[in-house]
Swiss-Prot record:
May play a role in signal transduction pathways that involve calcium as a second messenger. It comes from Oryza sativa subsp. japonica (Rice). This is Calcium-dependent protein kinase 19. Residues 85-343 form the Protein kinase domain. The active site is at 209 (proton acceptor).
Length: 533
């Protein structure tokens, strides 16, 4: 087959030694990362005191704005990964760092930890790339065919990304070992690969580097689930933007990438190349050099004459042709691939996918009402860069472009993500996300219910949210301020206030200070998510 890990910009991807948990940053374009302006501390409220020997004046605390740790890449204070996980043997090594087997101390469960050396992240673009990759992994985590993200940690020397351990090895290795797959096996794998593409596109992400090396098998079993693991070249899709930087790996790169004018359709092309290899054991466009490969891709002649193609079904060849159509506007979409007769008629039905958005909505409905209100405040202040993927999801679900999502639109949107919920379960999620109770989910409510928890870890977001409730700048959220907020958001009564105070007020002074508020937002004040059976 030749070397299938060449890059369009470099023959050495720097990723192969990392056991599928790759390092892709050297070929990625610079992305714009939001900068945050930290709010100034509020002026202390004016308080007049009458001096008394018996009652000395009490000065209310002033909540200082957060002070970020200098030179942090993740934008939050240093966090020692070794306080949660013990790092074990090396699994692989790449240009930017090392992947280790790690064990969660509390549970004994094993994961993979990619430790990226900060010394090697020399440029601003390198740091932005790491941030974006983590953001996309967090955004997509929770899907059946996407590796589960467990957490990101940063210390003085490294950024550590902990994720699901896939013990079955690379799909690429199995392809080489077998030479080719049966049509049934190829259809199963193709469905999983295209399902990843479909979910990425629905959630506003373009992968840009689909290839067998970037898929790992969850276990060593023959029918192990396939997991996409490497999102180092992925970007959030910007509506109307055509991308021009050449990225990807030589055999799998789409012709429009070489012409420097492309969109998300490139992922379907790459999946089509994978399907061709699954069926025949060789790539459709082959040459001794990268230039030769690129010339063959631009020429676009697909060989269906050599063995084993005469024995391959016409339906399979039809799907390959449609996925490898030169004109991206005429190329089949990922959703259409999944409906193609070769996949649809030859496959048993999939198990329901508990999608990322669904998982977060389940957690959201279990939160206390102060946390829901605070999330809404944070959501309304997030910038475009932070919510690109969720914005695309909202647009996809809001089919009538009304600016709100109805029950029917929510049900249809979740179905597109692969979830098979009953009407009662969808209604429960609808009621949870519909904070103001008007029967539909507006844009801010949707972002509030579905944004990933990592957004809450930024101190500046928590500080702004605390200031929103602390109207008199006293350094505390009082019962009166809580009551005012609940009335404004139409979210509760006196009993609700009592419940919130008792849950969050850990020092039992009848008020909520900034530390208690942060503890609640970072997890201390959230109940266990309810299970939908």
């Amino acid at each position: 087959m030749g070397s299938c890990c060449s890059r369009a910009t470099s023959p050495d991807s720097g990723r192969g030694g990392a056991n599928g948990y790759g390092y892709s940053h050297q070929t990625k374009p610079a992305q714009t990362t939001p900068s945050y302006n930290h709010p100034q501390p509020p002026p202390p409220a004016e308080v007049r005191y009458t001096p008394s020997a018996m009652n000395p004046p009490v000065v209310p605390p002033v909540v200082a704005p957060p002070k970020p740790t200098p030179d942090t890449i993740l934008g939050k204070p240093y966090d020692d990964v070794r306080s949660v996980y013990s790092l074990g043997k090396e699994l692989g090594r790449g240009q930017f760092g090392v992947t280790y087997l790690c064990t969660e101390i509390a549970s004994g469960k094993q994961y993979a930890c990619k430790s990226i050396s900060k010394r090697k992240l020399v440029s601003k673009a390198d740091k932005e790339d790491i941030r974006r990759e983590i953001q996309i992994m967090q955004h997509l985590s929770g899907q059946q065919n996407i590796v589960e993200f467990r957490g990101a940690y940063e210390d003085k020397s490294n950024v550590h990304v902990v994720m699901e351990l896939c013990a079955g090895g690379e799909l690429f290795d199995r392809i080489i070992a077998k030479g080719h797959y049966s049509e049934r096996a190829a259809a199963t794998i193709c469905r999983a690969v295209v399902n990843v593409v479909n979910i990425c596109h629905f959630m506003g992400v373009m992968h840009r580097d689909l290839k067998p090396e970037n898929f790992l098998l969850a276990t060593k079993e023959e029918n192990a689930m396939l997991k996409a693991t490497d999102f180092g070249l992925s970007v959030f899709i910007e509506e109307g933007k055509m991308y021009r930087d050449i990225v990807g790996s030589a055999y799998y790169v789409a012709p429009e990438v070489l012409r420097r004018n492309y969109g998300k359709e490139i992922d379907v092309w790459s999946a089509g190349v994978i399907l061709y290899i699954l069926l025949s054991g060789v790539p459709p466009f082959w040459a001794e050099t990268e230039k030769g490969i690129f010339d063959a891709i631009l020429q676009g002649e697909i060989d269906f004459e050599s063995q084993p193609w005469p024995s391959i079904s016409e339906s399979a060849k039809d799907l390959v042709r449609k996925m490898l159509t030169q004109d991206p506007k005429k190329r089949i979409t990922s959703a259409q691939v999944l409906q193609h007769p070769w996949l649809r008629d030859g496959e048993a039905s999939d198990k329901p996918i508990d999608s990322a958005v669904l998982s977060r909505m389940k957690q959201f409905r279990a939160m206390n009402k102060l946390k829901k209100m605070a999330l809404k405040v944070i959501a309304s202040n997030l910038n475009e860069e932070e919510i690109k993927g969720l914005k695309q999801m909202f647009t996809n679900m809001d089919t009538d472009n009304s600016g709100t999502i109805t029950y029917e639109e929510l049900k249809a949107g979740l179905a597109k993500l692969g979830s098979k919920l009953s009407e009662a379960e969808v209604k429960q999620l609808m009621e949870a996300a519909d904070v103001d109770g008007n029967g539909s989910i507006d844009y801010v409510e949707f972002i509030t219910a579905t944004m990933h928890r990592h957004k809450l870890e930024r101190d500046e977001h928590l500080f702004k949210a605390f200031q929103y409730f602390d109207k008199d700048n006293s350094g505390f959220i009082t019962r009166d301020e809580l009551e005012s907020a609940l009335i404004e958001h139409e979210m509760g009564d006196t009993s609700t206030i009592k419940d919130i105070i008792s849950e969050v007020d850990t020092d039992n002074d009848g008020r909520i200070n900034y530390e208690e508020f942060c503890a609640m937002m970072r997890g201390g004040g959230m109940q266990q998510p309810m299970r939908l059976k």
